[in-house]
Amino acid sequence: MASKSWLNFLTFLCGSAIGFFLCSQLLNILLQEQADVQPNMLHNDPHARHSDDSGHNHLKGQMDFNADSSQHKDENTDVAENLYQKVKVLCWVMTSPQNLEKKAKHVKATWAQRCNKVLFMSSEENKDFPTVGLETKEGREQLYWKTIKAFQYVHDHYLEDADWFMKADDDTYVILDNLRWLLSKYNPEQPIYFGRRFKPYVKQGYMSGGAGYVLSKEALRRFVDAFKTEKCTHSSSIEDLALGRCMEIIKVEAGDSRDPTGKETFHPFVPEHHLIKGYLPKTFWYWNYNYYPPVEGPGCCSDIAVSFHYVDSTTMYELEYLVYHLRPYGYLYRYQPALPENILKEINQVNKKEDTKIKLGNP
């Protein structure tokens, strides 16, 4: 009798175990399907800036939107080209060995081409891509170490090659021409940095890591020197907050990156999360973190936006097309914010010389 009861008990345990296993497998399949249909972009942690993989299907090959340049042959890029020469921006992109094919190569094929200099920073060197090996481990807890070492590397090797130094993730899309306009009003010898300004924990605020941030040459000097003199230390693994605290200690100003109408230019999410009302629930951390009152809907974003975050490989090319190729026929651009007088004067002088050449019949 006892052996029969024991056998029944074992049968029950085995059945329960098998049932639990099958249920867990089914649940995993359902959750994976849900992730593929609606990727999890709403991170509950405001400092979860850099993810290795969001579950998306990544494009395998690069795309070249400049292959057919015939439609752009009459395009006047004088102002952008002048700013390219006058406001030199070095971009360094935080990536990892496993993200080179998934993400970094699409950054390389799109917006990174407009940097005056671009570097891809990883834990390991890759001479083919290429990447700079920072000799760190991978993982979220290493982000600030990678940031410190990346800025130190840039300072030691490229300080005189640029005026401004931008950090971006490999899932950030940056419109460099708009960034140069923003920076053109400032002196790179001024200790200042720009990005999407958040307010908690730092009196002057700090810049969102995911939306990217840009340091002036003097800010970079002070940041690197602060670790040599131990004014700043690796106080936290939370990259953007720790960097913001250091900037306040070394008296680097947290600049206002809004446009003349008060709209934000750096964005910590993809466009639809800012543009569509109700996409971000009011209980979401984002609403309490902004230094300036956030706007939901069409008023959220400047016409001269600088960056968006959590951009997958497909969206990277969509933004490239929408920003640099799509135009409504018959319209002159409606919003052209003013340039600094010195740059505007130089552009006008160049245009006068070109007009003179044309009148004289010179090529």
UniProtKB/Swiss-Prot annotation:
The modification Phosphoserine is found at S235. Pathway: Protein modification; protein glycosylation. Residues 41-72 are annotated as: Disordered. A glycoprotein binds at W285. UDP binds at M94, E138, G139, R140, K146, D169, H309, Y310. Coiled coil: none annotated. GO terms for biological process: angiogenesis; intestinal epithelial cell development; kidney development; protein O-linked glycosylation. It comes from the Eukaryota. The chain crosses the membrane at residues 7-29. One of its GO terms (cellular component) is membrane. One of its GO terms (molecular function) is metal ion binding. Residues 44-56 have a biased composition (Basic and acidic residues). It is found in: Membrane. Disulfide bonds join C91-C115, C232-C246, C300-C301. Residues 2-6 are cytoplasmic. Its EC number is 2.4.1.122. Mn(2+) binds at D169, D171, H309. It is a single-pass type II membrane protein. Belongs to the glycosyltransferase 31 family. Beta3-Gal-T subfamily. PANTHER family: BETA1,3-GALACTOSYLTRANSFERASE (PTHR23033), GLYCOPROTEIN-N-ACETYLGALACTOSAMINE 3-BETA-GALACTOSYLTRANSFERASE 1 (PTHR23033:SF13). Homodimer; disulfide-linked. Interacts with the C1GALT1C1 chaperone; required for galactosyltransferase activity. This is Glycoprotein-N-acetylgalactosamine 3-beta-galactosyltransferase 1. It comes from Rattus norvegicus (Rat). The lineage of its organism: Eukaryota, Metazoa, Chordata, Craniata, Vertebrata. The gene is C1galt1.
